Amino acid sequence: MNILLTNDDGIQAVGLRALYHGLKRAGMNVQVVAPVAEQSAVGHAVSLSSPLRVKKFEEDGFTGLGVYGTPVDCVKLGLTTLLETKPDIVVSGINSGANVGVDILYSGTVSAATEGALMGYPAMAVSYDSFKPEELTDQGDYCAELLKKIPWDSLGDKTVVNLNFPAVPVKDAEELKICRHTRVSWQDWYEAREDPRGHKYYWLNGVMPKEKISPGTDRDLLTKGHITMTPLHFDFTDREAIATLEQSFGI
């Protein structure tokens, strides 16, 4: 199985390296094209006003291409130009921090997988519910085995499998649950701070209100210790609103 591996935390991130080695141990051919620098929460951004430069990374049994660009840049450049062998699957992760609910709109990790799907490839995004993962070897091995079990040919066109791990060892996690994503939005605020020179700046903070999270959704199940899998599809159409608007305009 040929894999294009990318992420949004950067090519030297713990999660990407763990997933790389897990896939390699499973006998897969892994080609890495990932951002040189962290690109968290850049969404589906592409570089239009700056050139994309590429740097080769080789160390400690790892080899990959780092791109001075966004996660989506990496996937587009990799699939169209850089890869020697076309992949069977595009895999993005393992991200530091869960990607559930509205996170999927902000996430560079999910967007990279989505770009792979839009370009016609099966795709999976993988995240871990902690911003400070120390050891993700077992999660990497789990993903490698899961990739073999997913019926990719039977999934809908341009479907992304969004996988999230709870912040516990795999052996201590609750069973895998296939579920929908929560529709709860973040309640955001900005903390006003001051730098050493007396200049004001702002730092984003926020919470996802627990009381508004529906039972059985990704955030709910992940909090309860389950590994969650949510199939995503790029289609923002509000079909009910179509009928309402047609009636309003007499169409």
Curated annotation (Swiss-Prot):
It comes from the Bacteria. InterPro entries: SurE, SurE-like_Pase/nucleotidase, SurE-like_sf. Keywords: Cytoplasm, Hydrolase, Metal-binding, Nucleotide-binding. Nucleotidase that shows phosphatase activity on nucleoside 5'-monophosphates. GO terms for cellular component: cytoplasm. It is found in: Cytoplasm. Binds 1 divalent metal cation per subunit. Belongs to the SurE nucleotidase family. Transmembrane segments: none annotated. PANTHER family: 5'-NUCLEOTIDASE SURE, PHOSPHATASE, PUTATIVE (AFU_ORTHOLOGUE AFUA_4G01070)-RELATED. It comes from Maridesulfovibrio salexigens (strain ATCC 14822 / DSM 2638 / NCIMB 8403 / VKM B-1763). Its cofactor is a divalent metal cation. SUPFAM superfamilies: SurE-like. The keyword Manganese does not apply. This is 5'-nucleotidase SurE. It holds the Pfam family SurE. Its EC number is 3.1.3.5. It catalyses: a ribonucleoside 5'-phosphate + H2O = a ribonucleoside + phosphate. A divalent metal cation binds at residues 8-9, 40, 95. Its main location: cytoplasm. Coiled coil: none annotated. One of its GO terms (molecular function) is 5'-nucleotidase activity. Gene3D superfamilies: Survival protein SurE-like phosphatase/nucleotidase (3.40.1210.10). It is an enzyme of class 3 (hydrolase).
